[in-house]
A protein has these predicted regions:
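Catalytic His-Asp charge-relay segment
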Residues: 173-180, 203
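Conserved strand-to-loop "acid loop" that flanks and positions the catalytic carboxylate
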Residues: 89, 177-184
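Conserved HGGG/HGGXW glycine-rich cap/lid loop of the alpha/beta-hydrolase fold
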Residues: 5-48, 79
Length: 234
C-alpha cells in the first residue's frame, strides 16, 4: 500500500499479544477525518523483527509519518522511528527504552502490576496471557465478552523480546505525544508518567485500562489527530 497524500500518514503499531486489529476502533475515526492510515502486522518475535516489519511499511509511504505505538509497540516505534520521514511519535500506554535499554529494564524499575502475574510460559520460549488476565487486568473496562475474544486471538510473544536493546531512541529527536492509562494493570502508571516526562511529551491522561485504544478510541484518536495537525501547521 502506497500513500502519496501530502497529509501525514499515520502508521499504527500494535503491542504484544495483539495484532493490527487492536486499532479497529481508532482506524474508522482517522479515516473519517481524511487521514491516511496503515496498521502494521508485526511478528512480535524480536525487536529487530518488529522494527524491520514496521520499516517495510514506512518505506511504502511518501511524505511525513506519524508513528503510533501501543504498549510493546512503543519500543518498536522508538527503534524504527529514526527514519527521516518520521516527524512525530505517539505513545499509548507504551514502553520507550533509551539507548542500550530494554523493555525488561523498564518493567523492573517499578513494582510489577498485577497483570504481569497472568503471563504464562509455554516452556518453549513463548509467552501468553491468561483469559483471567485479559478480563481483569488488560481490558478490565471492556465488556467481558470482548476481552475473552482478545484472549483467544492473542499471538504468542517471544520471551526474549524483553531483553532486546534499543539502539538509537527516536523520541530523543522527534516531537512526542504520550497517553497515560491511569487504570493500567499491565504497565506501571508511574513508569508511563516517567517516560512521558523524560521525552518531554505532550501528555494526556485517560482513566482507562491498558487498552484505551479499544475502551476510549475517541480520546486516543483525538491525540493522534493533534499530532497530525501539529505537523500540518509546522
Amino acid at each position: 500500500m502506497t500513500s502519496t497524500s501530502t497529509k501525514p500518514t499515520v502508521i499504527l503499531v500494535h503491542g504484544a499479544w495483539a495484532d493490527g486489529s487492536s486499532w479497529q476502533k481508532v482506524i474508522p475515526l482517522l479515516l473519517k477525518e481524511g487521514v491516511p492510515v496503515i496498521a502494521v502486522q508485526n511478528p512480535t518475535s524480536s525487536l529487530a523483527d518488529d522494527a524491520a516489519a514496521t520499516r517495510r511499511i514506512m518505506n511504502s509511504v511518501e511524505g511525513p509519518i506519524v508513528l503510533v505505538g501501543h504498549s510493546w509497540g512503543g519500543a518498536v516505534i522508538t527503534e524504527a522511528g529514526t527514519d527521516p520521514k518520521v516527524k512525530a511519535l505517539v505513545y499509548v500506554a507504551a514502553f520507550a527504552p533509551n539507548a542500550g535499554e530494554t523493555v525488561g529494564d523498564q518493567v523492573g524499575r517499578y513494582p510489577a502490576p498485577p497483570g504481569l502475574s497472568q503471563i504464562k510460559n509455554d516452556g518453549a520460549g513463548y509467552l501468553t496471557l491468561s483469559e483471567e488476565g485479559w478480563i481483569n487486568d488488560v481490558g478490565q473496562d471492556l465488556p467481558k465478552e470482548e476481552a475473552r475474544v482478545l484472549a483467544v486471538l492473542q499471538p504468542p510473544l517471544a520471551a526474549s523480546t524483553f531483553g532486546d536493546k534499543v539502539t538509537e531512541p527516536a523520541w530523543v529527536s522527534r516531537r512526542t505525544w504520550y497517553i497515560v492509562s491511569t487504570q493500567d494493570r499491565v504497565v506501571s502508571v508511574d513508569l508511563e508518567r516517567e517516560l512521558a516526562a523524560a521525552m518531554g511529551a505532550k501528555t494526556t491522561e485517560l482513566a482507562a485500562s491498558h487498552l484505551s485504544l479499544l475502551s476510549m478510541p475517541e480520546a486516543v484518536t483525538s491525540v493522534i489527530l493533534d499530532a497530525v495537525a501539529a505537523l500540518e501547521t509546522a
